[in-house]
Every structure is written in C-alpha cells, then in structure tokens.
C-alpha cells in the first residue's frame, strides 16, 4: 500500500503542476511578449532495498518557448518589437535589471518610459529613460528614443537597452514573469 500512495501522490502532483502551466499559458496567450512555459516529466525509479517497484514523477525540463509571436502593426509610435532574439531591459520591482519581450512602451506621469505594467524601461547605459514634459516621442528601429517639444527639432534622449542572450548565459524565467541572466 505504501508504494502505491507515493507513486499516486507524485503522479498527481505532476499532473496538477502541468495543468497549472497549461492554464497560465492559455491565460496569457494574448499578452504582449509572453513566453509560454514548458514542463515535461519523467518516471524515476527509487533505488534501495525493497524499493525497486517504486517510481516517482520528476519534472525533467522546465523552460520557456523562445519563438517570437507574430508582429502586429499598431500605428502607435511607442510600440516596438525586438528582433533577432533581443530582449528589452527593464528595472524589476526588486530593483534589479530584468528582461522582457513586451514592447508596449508608455510614458508615466513623471516622464519615465515604462512597460504597460509600470516597469521602467532602461537605456543602453542602464538608467531609466525620462522624457521632457509634453514631448512627442518616437522610437527608431535601432532603439533610439527621440523627443520633440513644440516646434523644436527632435533630440535623442536615450536608446533602449537590448540584450541578446547566448547559449552560455541563457535567460531564466523569474517568479514575476520577467527573465534574468
């Protein structure tokens, strides 16, 4: 009886975990920049005397789907898409640098550029990008952010920090949904 309970328990835990991952993926299917989570499981036999018939379910691969979703034209000057595997650098809620593929940029009331969920967008030097009051902003294909105030010519106020992870230093999903090196 003992063997059956533990085998059933680990199988049920794996099924619940898999269902949670699938539900999260479905709930976020239309979220800008979302990366679907992956989870696979394998059977692991327990070693030891009298335990040869015990098998447990163990998560074998936890990761994320790293393919870009479809590009959608929004005709909004602050909507951008990182190309060629690049990620936008943002300041996470814990103050550390984190990465996202969400290119929906907004201007906060204090003038800083933020993501749709309020995280500050970082410039190539690692500092937040701040816009002058009342400026009309544009983002160039190379990530340069320009501000035009009134009839004055547009001036570059920063450049989006883009990070391309390598196989030697991959990004890992954090509990907050952001990625970190």
Question: What name fits each language-model region?
Answer:
Residues 1-181:
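Amphipathic alpha-helical polymerization modules
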